[in-house]
């Protein structure tokens, strides 16, 4: 007889190999066909809402690993919430205006934006933005992200733009919007002003020079033959110099250096001496900074210009001379201190970073090139005391990566002072995860200057302001804002560029300033894109005709930690300014993606990992598993090596699921499930371990600690199940009577474990759990998707503290037995564990635990025989456990090997009909497998 046919061996069609690159797109297609998003929304209608508001990625280029991390984290949260009793809609969005799109449109069309019709140009920009938004949408869906992909938000939608105009108008109404001459970050390459959030720092080599400003009028304090020395790394700003700032409380010295009388801060004299290569410096006099106020110096190369010595708290002793070259047109602090002294604001630089006619002999030169010319000029006039090159951190444009500079221009600003205190209070009312985010954004808002909201670009939402051609004053009223809002809602912002000002204003408009003006012109600047995305809390969350399921404030904003100064900040500013409240309840930030050495990913380093390539080679679930595997609050590393580890972890989880499925082929949970009180103790312990896992994982999801979800589930599959419970019950599953209580009890646990694992893993391994769900037995009707199930609940009945204590002890004992078996295997006493007989010598609590379950010990240790003895009877060569009252001996089991269960038994051969079986197997075969 072929006894293998009498075994209940695993049967399942669930494939061992994931083959994810082929299977996942099929699953994705299925989700689209059944309109899964809609189905989930219908199922959860009327439940408590959970709104995760999507920070819009920029509609430019394919998605990268950072996008993957961000979108998968959001998807994990939304899926968890929708399986936990919440109505959790997810509306993806895109940031669709701004410079990079303009640049790409210019590049692809080969045009000059100054020579093209703005309406045509904007149409090209729109096409480009929507093309990439659609591409990214497909790529995000390939990652398994569930959302309202048919109805996303774009910042270029007419309704969105109209709401943005309303936000701007409300801020203007409250007096927060003003026009002013002020130094702003300026990018010559992009020809536009930049907000602080658009600035990044990178190394740059600059000239470091020490320059003499001869004293013209010492005010009875400084001698006429002295010179105040300044230090600068931007020689090109010297043509705009009008003052020298000193700190009122620092000590300054008049010193003889290289046969010249110079003035520098006392504390910096030594470093100055070294910098200019002087051997000696003799101090001739000492002054308090405030004594030098209003001393007049001569500009080093503009003969008709004086430079006034003024006092400034911004002066430091970190480097230089303690006397700071001050050009109010090229620096924020310079501008502030210059205002106090009513100094002129000079900025003789045009949009492209070239000197204008006001720059005199430097006219037409690009500022960075002019450094050289200016240094030559200083040398000729004997005004240069020292010159070296230094490498330092310098602001660059985050778009084009070119160095930028401060330039005073007329710009539109949002006055942060108007709502700063409210914003700071709002920050305290929001939950920040990780908690350090709170202080980070608080300090940023507390210290930030006014927000420059205007940009000199075409592709954006226009600043809705008119100018009266009679009196020249700007006009922004409730009437004009309401009118423009209505026009934009109907036609989009293109209408601003298509029509003249007089066609855009309300027909009845008369200039409110002069009372007679009827002829108008319109503002040509557009809004900062941070104002676009920063208005989404009203433009999306409060736009019921487009997204009725959304509501304000959002429960959660989740982006990279760079958004403390970006989207979190701009959203907070517009929300507090307009509504007095924050736009979000909780803000969660993640780190950035790096390689395994912690380096930023870059093409030049060759360490860029393409998520789409991973999807086509390994599968999106491998990437999703990676996102869940590390603490995303720090930077996340990814490399081929890490991907290999993820694939291995995935394989273990998949194999566990396959084993569970394979042993449930004949199990109907409705008919065959065994009641808890009828389960053997081992099975009750297994259920307790499962429900401890459920409790831990649900708490981790609630706390956004997905790495705990991953490690707990992985550990459960590999250790609690595979290396313990599943190993022990294999004999029962395969050899017992198919419908027996002992087998059905084990299957009950397997079913509960599979059912819980599928639910717990769905937010992470969305594709794989969908596949498992197709094959597993279910109670009632099978739902259209695994994502429509609810999270498992913890059953407190399964939590038995006494049982847990007892089995903790059994685990310790088992560990000692397995160790001894391993030694016996190495010493060739046995081949595998079933060839072993184990003698245990026990006392105390070990005896207490093992004695009542003596009959189950062969199963528990997966050996053929276990004998229990008192510890006192232990022979000298028995192995003693270090921390337990236990000694053990392993020997070869007596008797023959049963052909069916492979255990050794002294009675194998006693049954003539089944001579190769042990009594247990012979009975099962006779009663259930004999024709």
Curated annotation (Swiss-Prot):
UniProtKB keywords: Aminoacyl-tRNA synthetase, ATP-binding, Cytoplasm, Ligase, Metal-binding, Nucleotide-binding, Protein biosynthesis, Zinc
Entry cofactors: Zn(2+)
Localization (cell): Cytoplasm
Transmembrane segments: none
Enzyme class: ligase
Residue numbers spanned by region Disordered: 1-25
Regions of compositional bias (Polar residues) in chain numbering: 1-14
Enzyme Commission (EC) number: 6.1.1.5
Signal peptide (from-to): none
Record carries keyword Translocase: no
Cysteines engaged in disulfide bonds, as pairs: none
Motif window: 'KMSKS' region: 600-604
Binding positions for ATP per the UniProt entry: 603
Residues that coordinate or bind Zn(2+): 898, 901, 918, 921
Reactions this protein catalyses: tRNA(Ile) + L-isoleucine + ATP = L-isoleucyl-tRNA(Ile) + AMP + diphosphate
Gene Ontology terms: biological process: isoleucyl-tRNA aminoacylation
InterPro entries with a match to the protein in the record: aa-tRNA-synth_I_CS (IPR001412), aa-tRNA-synth_Ia (IPR002300), Anticodon_Ile_BEm (IPR033708), Ile-tRNA-ligase (IPR002301), Ile-tRNA-ligase_type1 (IPR023585), Ile-tRNA_ligase (IPR050081), M/V/L/I-tRNA-synth_anticd-bd (IPR013155), Rossmann-like_a/b/a_fold (IPR014729)
Binding positions for L-isoleucyl-5'-AMP per the UniProt entry: 559
Similarity-based family: Belongs to the class-I aminoacyl-tRNA synthetase family. IleS type 1 subfamily.
Oligomer and partners: Monomer.
Free-text domain note: IleRS has two distinct active sites: one for aminoacylation and one for editing. The misactivated valine is translocated from the active site to the editing site, which sterically excludes the correctly activated isoleucine. The single editing site contains two valyl binding pockets, one specific for each substrate (Val-AMP or Val-tRNA(Ile)).
Task of the protein: Catalyzes the attachment of isoleucine to tRNA(Ile). As IleRS can inadvertently accommodate and process structurally similar amino acids such as valine, to avoid such errors it has two additional distinct tRNA(Ile)-dependent editing activities. One activity is designated as 'pretransfer' editing and involves the hydrolysis of activated Val-AMP. The other activity is designated 'posttransfer' editing and involves deacylation of mischarged Val-tRNA(Ile).
Name of the protein in question: Isoleucine--tRNA ligase
Species, as recorded: Desulforamulus reducens (strain ATCC BAA-1160 / DSM 100696 / MI-1) (Desulfotomaculum reducens)
């Amino acid at each position: 007889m072929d006894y293998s046919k009498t075994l209940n061996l695993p049967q399942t069609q669930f494939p061992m190999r994931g083959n994810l690159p082929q299977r996942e797109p099929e699953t994705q297609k299925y989700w689209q066909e059944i309109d899964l998003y809609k189905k989930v929304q219908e199922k959860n209608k009327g439940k408590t809402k959970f709104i995760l508001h999507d920070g819009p990625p920029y509609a430019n280029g394919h998605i990268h690993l950072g996008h993957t991390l961000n979108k998968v984290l959001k998807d994990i949260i939304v899926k968890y919430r929708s399986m936990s009793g919440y109505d959790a809609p997810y509306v993806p969005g895109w940031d669709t205006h701004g410079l990079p799109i303009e640049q790409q449109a210019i590049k692809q069309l080969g045009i000059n934006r100054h020579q093209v019709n703005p309406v045509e140009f904007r149409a090209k920009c729109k096409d480009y933005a929507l093309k990439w938004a659609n591409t990214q949408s497909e790529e995000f869906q390939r990652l398994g992200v569930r959302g309202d992909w048919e109805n996303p938000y774009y910042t270029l939608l007419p309704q969105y733009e109209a709401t943005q105009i309303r936000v701007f108008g409300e801020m203007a109404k409250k007096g927060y919007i003003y026009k002013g001459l002020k130094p702003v970050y300026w990018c010559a390459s992009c020809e536009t002003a930049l907000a602080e959030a658009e600035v990044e720092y990178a190394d740059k080599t600059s000239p470091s020079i020490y320059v003499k400003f001869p004293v013209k009028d010492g005010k009875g304090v400084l001698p006429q033959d002295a010179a105040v020395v300044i230090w600068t790394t931007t020689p090109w700003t010297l043509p705009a110099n009008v003052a020298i700032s000193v700190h009122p409380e620092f000590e300054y010295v008049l010193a003889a250096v290289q046969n010249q009388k110079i003035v520098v801060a006392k504390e910096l004299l030594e470093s100055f001496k070294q910098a200019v290569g002087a051997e000696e410096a003799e101090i001739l006099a000492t002054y308090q900074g405030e004594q030098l106020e209003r001393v007049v110096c001569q500009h080093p190369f503009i003969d008709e210009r004086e430079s006034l010595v003024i006092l400034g708290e911004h002066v430091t002793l970190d480097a230089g001379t303690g006397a700071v070259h001050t050009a109010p047109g090229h620096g924020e602090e310079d501008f502030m201190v210059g205002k106090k002294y009513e100094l002129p604001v000079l900025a003789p630089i045009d949009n492209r970073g070239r000197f204008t006619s006001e720059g005199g002999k430097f006219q037409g030169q690009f500022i960075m090139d002019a450094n050289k010319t200016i240094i030559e000029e200083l040398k000729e006039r004997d005004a240069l005391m020292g010159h070296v090159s230094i490498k330092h951190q310098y602001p660059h444009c985050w778009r084009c990566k070119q160095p930028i500079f401060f330039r005073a221009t007329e710009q539109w600003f949002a006055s942060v002072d108007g709502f700063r205190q409210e914003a700071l209070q709002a920050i305290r009312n929001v939950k920040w995860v990780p908690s350090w985010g709170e202080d980070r954004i608080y300090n940023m808002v507390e210290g930030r200057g006014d927000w420059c909201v205007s940009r000199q670009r075409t592709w954006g939402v226009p600043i809705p302001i008119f100018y009266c051609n009679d009196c020249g004053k700007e006009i922004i009223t409730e009437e004009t804002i309401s009118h423009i809002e209505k026009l934009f809602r109907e036609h989009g912002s293109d209408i601003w560029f298509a029509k003249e000002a007089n066609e855009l204003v309300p027909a009845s408009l008369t200039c409110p300033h002069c009372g007679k003006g009827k002829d108008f012109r319109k503002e040509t600047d557009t809004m900062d894109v941070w104002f676009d995305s920063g208005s989404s809390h009203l433009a999306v969350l409060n736009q019921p005709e487009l997204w009725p399921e959304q509501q304000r404030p959002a429960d959660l904003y989740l982006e990279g930690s760079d958004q403390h100064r970006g989207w979190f900040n701009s959203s907070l500013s517009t929300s507090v300014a307009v509504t007095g409240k924050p736009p979000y309840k909780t803000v969660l930030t993640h780190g950035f993606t790096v390689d395994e050495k912690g380096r930023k990913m870059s093409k030049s380093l060759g360490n860029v990992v393409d998520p789409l390539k991973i999807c086509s080679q390994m599968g999106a679930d491998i990437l999703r598993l990676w996102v869940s595997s590390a603490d995303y609050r720090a930077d996340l590393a990814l490399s081929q090596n890490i991907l290999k580890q993820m694939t291995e972890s995935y394989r273990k989880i998949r194999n566990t699921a396959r084993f569970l499925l394979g042993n449930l082929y004949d199990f109907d949970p409705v008919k065959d499930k065994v009641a808890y009180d009828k389960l053997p103790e081992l099975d009750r312990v297994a259920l307790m371990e499962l429900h401890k896992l459920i409790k831990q994982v649900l708490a981790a999801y609630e706390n956004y600690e997905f790495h705990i979800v991953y490690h707990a589930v992985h550990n459960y599959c590999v250790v609690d199940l595979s290396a313990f419970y599943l190993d022990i019950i294999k004999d029962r599953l395969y050899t017992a009577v198919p419908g027996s209580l002992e087998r059905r009890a084990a299957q009950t646990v397997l079913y509960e474990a599979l059912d819980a694992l599928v639910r717990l893993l769905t937010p992470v391994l969305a594709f794989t759990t969908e596949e498992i769900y197709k094959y597993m037995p279910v109670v009632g009707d099978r739902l259209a998707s695994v994502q429509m199930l609810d999270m498992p609940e913890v059953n407190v009945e399964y939590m038995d503290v006494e049982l847990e204590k007892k089995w903790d002890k059994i685990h310790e004992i088992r560990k000692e037995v397995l160790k001894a078996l391993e030694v016996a295997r190495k010493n060739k006493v046995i081949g595998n564990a079933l060839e072993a007989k184990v003698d245990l010598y026990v006392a105390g609590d070990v005896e207490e635990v093992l004695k009542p379950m003596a009959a189950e010990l062969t199963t528990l240790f997966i050996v053929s025989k276990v004998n229990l003895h008192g510890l006192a009877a232990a022979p000298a060569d028995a192995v003693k456990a270090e921390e337990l009252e236990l000694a053990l001996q392993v020997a070869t089991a007596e008797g023959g090997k049963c052909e069916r269960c492979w255990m050794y038994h002294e009675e194998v051969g006693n049954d003539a009909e089944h001579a190769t079986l042990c009594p247990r197997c012979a009975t099962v075969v006779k009663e259930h497998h004999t024709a």
